[in-house]
Amino acid sequence: MEYLNFMADVYGVGAQERKAHIEKYLALFELENAAGEQIKSYSRGMKQKLTIIGALVHQPPVWVLDEPMVGLDPRAAHILKEEMRKHCEKGNTVFFSTHVLEVAEKLCDEIAIIDKGHLVAQGTLEALRSGEKGASLEQLFLELTESEEKQA
């Protein structure tokens, strides 16, 4: 709880709002029973959930998440994906990085492919396919990054 209160302090979250958001996310990610324990006793997945809660406790309109599914169990990953969808449905934005291209394919309205620090392609999945009907994001990624390597 100290970590989450610290994160709320950093963002100036008031006492009532803080309590409500922390309770909501602890319940959502099934961490209520572990809230009083030291973080060093947490598993990798529990630490990841706690980090996510800390990032969301101030309800930012834009979420920037780096590999947010790493370490999460399937239930927690599903919950996070649903929260990301709900956030976007409210007119907000979620930027997230992932190496699991199927997740990006299912969740994203816009996709950016970055290879060795360079933006290789950006747009909707349909636009990126541009004539390659049925091409998966994985196939597109491999084609785009391979051609970049050959050009170098």
For the regions a protein language model found, what residue spans apply to each?
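Hydrophobic aliphatic residues
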Residues: 8, 84, 132, 144-145
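ABC-family P-loop ATPase nucleotide-binding domain
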Residues: 148-152
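ABC transporter nucleotide-binding domains
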Residues: 1-96, 101-115, 119-121
